[in-house]
From Swiss-Prot:
This is ATP synthase subunit beta 2. GO terms for molecular function: ATP binding; ATP hydrolysis activity; proton-transporting ATP synthase activity, rotational mechanism; proton-transporting ATPase activity, rotational mechanism. GO terms for cellular component: plasma membrane; proton-transporting ATP synthase complex. Belongs to the ATPase alpha/beta chains family. The keyword Cytoplasm does not apply. It is a peripheral membrane protein. Keywords: ATP synthesis, ATP-binding, Cell inner membrane, Cell membrane, CF(1), Hydrogen ion transport, Ion transport, Membrane, Nucleotide-binding, Translocase, Transport. F-type ATPases have 2 components, CF(1) - the catalytic core - and CF(0) - the membrane proton channel. CF(1) has five subunits: alpha(3), beta(3), gamma(1), delta(1), epsilon(1). CF(0) has three main subunits: a(1), b(2) and c(9-12). The alpha and beta chains form an alternating ring which encloses part of the gamma chain. CF(1) is attached to CF(0) by a central stalk formed by the gamma and epsilon chains, while a peripheral stalk is formed by the delta and b chains. InterPro entries: AAA+_ATPase, Alt_ATPase_F1_bsu, ATP-synt_VA_C, ATP_synth_F1_bsu, ATPase_alpha/beta_chains, ATPase_F1/V1/A1_a/bsu_N, ATPase_F1/V1/A1_a/bsu_N_sf, ATPase_F1/V1/A1_a/bsu_nucl-bd. ATP binds at G155, G156, A157, G158, V159, G160, K161, T162. It comes from Nitrosospira multiformis (strain ATCC 25196 / NCIMB 11849 / C 71). It is found in: Cell inner membrane. The lineage of its organism: Bacteria, Pseudomonadati, Pseudomonadota, Betaproteobacteria, Nitrosomonadales. Produces ATP from ADP in the presence of a proton gradient across the membrane. The catalytic sites are hosted primarily by the beta subunits. SUPFAM superfamilies: C-terminal domain of alpha and beta subunits of F1 ATP synthase, N-terminal domain of alpha and beta subunits of F1 ATP synthase, P-loop containing nucleoside triphosphate hydrolases.
Amino acid sequence: MDAAAPDLGIGIVAAVRGGIVDIRFANRPPSIRSLVRTGKAGEIVIEILSQLDAHRVRGIALTPTQGLARGMLVKDTGGPLRAPVGRATLSRMFDVFGEVIDRKPPPCDAQWRTVHHSPPPLVRRSTRSEIFETGIKIIDVLMPLERGGKAGLLGGAGVGKTILLTEMIHNVAGRHRGVSIFCGIGERCREGEELYRDIMAAGVLENMVMVFGQMNEPPGARFRVAHAALTMAEYFRDDEHRDVLLLVDNIYRFIQAGMEVSGLMGQMPSRMGYQPTMGTELAQLEERIAHTDNGAITSIQAVYVPADDFSDPAAVHAFSHFSASIVLSRKRASEGLYPAIDPLQSGAKMATPSVIGERHYRIAQETRHTLAQYTELKDVIAMLGLEQLSPEDRALVARARRLERFFTQPFFTTEHFTGIKGKLVSLEDALDGCERILRDEYRDLPEQALYMIGKASEAEPGGSAKNASS
């Protein structure tokens, strides 16, 4: 390596323990969060995380450390990790270092900015509450998302988190004139490749940027990829004054990567092995997602819940930052009610009459009440049968079952699996359908007629032809 540059510090590797590297500098060591390079061609990148004494620092490797040995020269790059920003990044796929991974030439006119930024000050934040429509009935009616807010997709493995995120990318591209940033943290390489091809086939790649920290990469890279994606999103919000949809899959992998880094750094673990700084690290990321006077970053984040335990510290900390929570139910998935969203466990803080309006609030509350009463009656039905219920309770059960089926929806991103054409439903059409079901206007129709349709009118005789596979 070049040791002739007097303005950049040169050190030597003092110790290597897995992904943790101790480095000694003869002069002043680099500052915290600086990047240093080592290896035969400078291919090993290390981020400084702590200073041990006047001459020694400790860092986490952001790349594999094969071939690294004590005594190797280390060069300070003179700055922190940076990410490319600008219109040149649209329709491209990057890794944590801002290098393209889509087999195309790198963007030639992209700007580069540090991934470490402070959240916007309070005076720049907007306090207006606006609904961010997704085109998905159950979300827009029962747990409306807030423009500039954060929503969590909570669920265990295999209940449809990634499918729901992909559908939102498709719908938002057609409904909102903005930019989508997809951040894959700990993604399987196969899933990232499939997602890229699906989005390209759907024709929404031109207004999208994809950033991946794959599960085979070191924990340091997976920990920093979310900051890189957020830096790209902040450019479109602050410089181009555009609305941004930031999709994160999976925020639990961000916490998990931080836990690995913390363990490697020798920090004392807290409850269930998580890092003691988990709350701070998550807040530093989440508070940068905001609605300002320039634009808004609206974030939808998948949260893997270990063993479906919602009291897990990672789920609890993530949940505290969300303005809406979308809880996916394995039981509903087993019943074929897709999207498998639990309407009673899910909710939104902005679902108040002053924000969403009296009519929307009334319909949502009546719907929840009907579904909650049906849940209470399920045990009675299982033991005694439906015939033992009063006529009023039987009518309530019929309404609830029709509501459950009306809230199913065919997705554009699953057309090639199901053979059913995807449907995008406006909030007004979704509210109208719920209201008509609550008024028993469809009591003479079989409940299956409301399954996997868009508008409620499609279930009526002479309405849109329903796919036979429903």
